[in-house]
Amino acid sequence: MASLLGTSSSAIWASPSLSSPSSKPSSSPICFRPGKLFGSKLNAGIQIRPKKNRSRYHVSVMNVATEINSTEQVVGKFDSKKSARPVYPFAAIVGQDEMKLCLLLNVIDPKIGGVMIMGDRGTGKSTTVRSLVDLLPEINVVAGDPYNSDPIDPEFMGVEVRERVEKGEQVPVIATKINMVDLPLGATEDRVCGTIDIEKALTEGVKAFEPGLLAKANRGILYVDEVNLLDDHLVDVLLDSAASGWNTVEREGISISHPARFILIGSGNPEEGELRPQLLDRFGMHAQVGTVRDADLRVKIVEERARFDSNPKDFRDTYKTEQDKLQDQISTARANLSSVQIDRELKVKISRVCSELNVDGLRGDIVTNRAAKALAALKGKDRVTPDDVATVIPNCLRHRLRKDPLESIDSGVLVSEKFAEIFS
């Protein structure tokens, strides 16, 4: 892999310049009233009716309207958050090639299922993940929709937008960059899932729903730093949403659902606690990060960081060409991904590796196939080779192996040894 990535990203990747990060959805609540449309953001008529033989209520969306003065206003809102906090350039990250490759492959193919990054303190895990925001491509979303609904694909539409499309209504569309949402350790369940005002719903027939972080992360990236320290009840919420692609908020018999399909990226220090196996298996790939030992590289990292801290704008301008090239290569890889082929013989060998390593389930097989195709697309090829599989398979399987407390060999080494045995 070192030969592929090197110590600088400039040797391999690069991209169409998309400098404007996406904006936050409106922080104001979304108000719903039975049989009536109102409000200035997103409005929905809600019918509240008692279920048979039950004293509670069920809330169903009946109709929706979106009022926007002009598309220019929405675009302005998306552009208003230009570089509020300077981000360290991805191309300037020294070393950590395994982590960078896993992140890029997930941007190329979000269906890989995310990355879990584990490593020592101060090794650049959070810096690298957040630097990815400059490289994220643009997507089309329905203007004014808090769930970043896709205007074409029903699988990525909120309920309200889908009903409007089914009625033949033309929905306003804008282009914005893929969103990266940080999930803080201290977040409450209501902040993550969204909030329903139960009192208004039951007494006045008015339901105010404010979308949470999962709504904002739909069709984007959800980043959890120190994910191994996350509260168990929030881990359960992430598991449910990652498995189903939908987030359902239930409060006193009142229910509302919205799409929540996101790339889950987590980072943490294994010394601070292990991750629950149920959550670990949800990550498509696993990257291990170690401290740089080479003295020259350490000096270079310190000097580069000092330059960035003293003048972030000039430092980012220094790497603009490399960033643009990397963006261009990512966009090309995303466009060509569907045409990349993988031979059946390689698929069979991948499944043999998974079977002989006693990997539970089929996620390992699926993710390895997807990651190998994404790597081939990144290299500009239309067919997967054994070298592509060899590069990604340790990251796809190491966290799925059953733990042996007496085993001192790294799981990635075991995967590589089994790969060499079967592919030789």
UniProtKB/Swiss-Prot annotation:
The modification N-acetylvaline is found at V61. The modification Phosphoserine is found at S355. Its EC number is 6.6.1.1. Signal peptide: none annotated. CDD domains: AAA. Residues 1-60 form a transit peptide. GO terms for cellular component: chloroplast; chloroplast stroma; cytosol; magnesium chelatase complex; plant-type cell wall. Pathway: Porphyrin-containing compound metabolism; chlorophyll biosynthesis. The keyword Lyase does not apply. The keyword Phosphoprotein applies. ATP binds at G119, D120, R121, G122, T123, G124, K125, S126. It comes from the Eukaryota. GO terms for biological process: chlorophyll biosynthetic process; photosynthesis. It is found in: Plastid, Chloroplast. GO terms for molecular function: ATP binding; ATP hydrolysis activity; magnesium chelatase activity. InterPro entries: AAA+_ATPase, CHLI-like, ChlI/MoxR_AAA_lid, Mg_chelatase_ATPase-isu, Mg_chelatse_chII-like_cat_dom, P-loop_NTPase. Keywords: Acetylation, ATP-binding, Chlorophyll biosynthesis, Chloroplast, Disulfide bond, Ligase, Nucleotide-binding, Phosphoprotein, Photosynthesis, Plastid, Transit peptide. It catalyses: protoporphyrin IX + Mg(2+) + ATP + H2O = Mg-protoporphyrin IX + ADP + phosphate + 3 H(+). Belongs to the Mg-chelatase subunits D/I family. Involved in chlorophyll biosynthesis. Catalyzes the insertion of magnesium ion into protoporphyrin IX to yield Mg-protoporphyrin IX. The magnesium-chelatase is a complex of three subunits, CHLI, CHLD and CHLH. The reaction takes place in two steps, with an ATP-dependent activation followed by an ATP-dependent chelation step. Possesses high affinity for ATP and may play a major role in chlorophyll biosynthesis. Does not bind abscisic acid (ABA), but is a positive regulator of ABA signaling. This is Magnesium-chelatase subunit ChlI-1, chloroplastic. It comes from Arabidopsis thaliana (Mouse-ear cress). The lineage of its organism: Eukaryota, Viridiplantae, Streptophyta, Embryophyta, Tracheophyta.
